[in-house]
Every structure is written in structure tokens, then in C-alpha cells.
């Protein structure tokens, strides 16, 4: 299925007996967050953007829904609200390779180390809020992604008994951060 975002949004706003499973190509570069969200909700198939560089801006919930699934976006993304969570940011980070800007950098994040790694491995603005790692199965790679200059907030490990093994430089980087 291929067409401009407005036409595809109209198609997917209709009620179908079954969810569309085929690929969808958005052929124009004038799509917006609302249209991308509607198209993504209407298909389980891969979404291909002819213009992957369109900037998107909106609240984290809408951005996560627009960028969920298989999509090839690489434009800038701005999260405008201060109510985002780890799940939403992980979906956004998984859906774009573009720069992610947090308008409110102070929001506390709490979640699984692998989701936090997904977020902080992306090109994201420096986060200044507290970060809590909630699982007890984190590793050096995950902690390094969280601690490697992407956040200046205090990092809390809910389980601080996990044994860590790794390169001395990586461990030094991790432990140079502020832990609660």
C-alpha cells in the first residue's frame, strides 16, 4: 500500500474486518505526527517513509505510538511534554535514528536496564533527572550506556548486589557517576 500521508490516514480511519498486515509506504514528505500515528495504528506491516528526515514534535505518548513497529525514520524528534516514561522513550528511540530532544530534561526515569540502554544509546539531549534501574540483571554494557555522559542525574540501582565484570576503563566510567 503506497500513498501520501493524508490519503493513508483516511484509509486507515475506516473500520476493516482485519488489521492490515502488509507494508505501507508514505510517499510524501509532508506527513505529521498525527498522520504517522494513524498509519502506524492501521497496519502491522513495515512502514517505509520516502522522506525519512521529517522532524516530529509532540508529547511522548503520541510520538511512541507514531514510531512504534517497524519504521525507518531518521529526522529530529522533540518530546514536548514532561510526563514521558521509559517505555515511551524506548519506543521513540527504537523508531528513529534522528536526534531526540527532551524539552523537559529533569523527568525522573525508572525502568529496566535494557530499556534505559536503548534510550541512552541514541542521540538524545543530556538528561538531568534521576535514573532508577529497576531490574537485577543489568550488566556493564547497560550501565555504561546509562552512565556515559547522557545523564547527570543521580543513578539508583534497586539491586546493588549484582556482580559486575568488565574492562577497567568501562568500570571507572560507570563508577565516576553519582549513585544513590
Residue ranges and their predicted role:
Residues 1-180:
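General marker for long, soluble alpha-helical cores
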Amino acid at each position: 500500500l503506497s500513498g501520501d500521508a493524508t490519503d493513508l490516514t483516511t484509509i486507515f480511519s475506516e473500520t476493516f474486518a482485519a488489521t492490515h498486515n502488509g507494508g505501507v509506504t508514505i510517499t510524501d514528505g509532508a506527513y505529521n505526527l498525527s498522520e504517522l500515528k494513524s498509519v502506524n495504528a492501521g497496519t502491522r506491516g513495515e512502514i517505509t517513509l520516502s522522506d525519512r528526515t521529517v522532524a516530529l514534535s509532540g508529547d511522548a505518548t503520541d510520538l511512541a505510538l507514531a514510531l512504534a513497529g517497524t519504521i525507518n525514520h531518521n529526522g529530529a524528534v522533540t518530546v514536548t511534554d514532561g510526563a514521558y516514561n521509559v517505555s515511551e522513550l524506548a519506543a521513540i528511540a527504537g523508531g528513529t535514528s534522528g536526534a531526540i530532544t527532551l524539552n523537559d530534561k529533569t523527568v525522573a526515569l525508572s525502568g529496566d536496564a535494557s530499556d534505559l540502554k536503548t534510550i541512552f544509546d541514541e542521540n538524545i539531549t543530556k538528561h538531568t533527572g534521576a535514573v532508577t534501574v529497576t531490574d537485577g540483571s543489568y550488566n556493564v554494557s547497560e550501565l555504561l550506556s546509562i552512565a556515559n555522559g547522557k545523564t547527570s542525574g543521580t543513578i539508583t540501582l534497586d539491586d546493588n548486589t549484582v556482580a559486575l565484570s568488565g574492562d577497567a576503563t568501562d568500570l571507572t566510567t560507570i563508577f565516576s557517576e553519582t549513585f544513590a
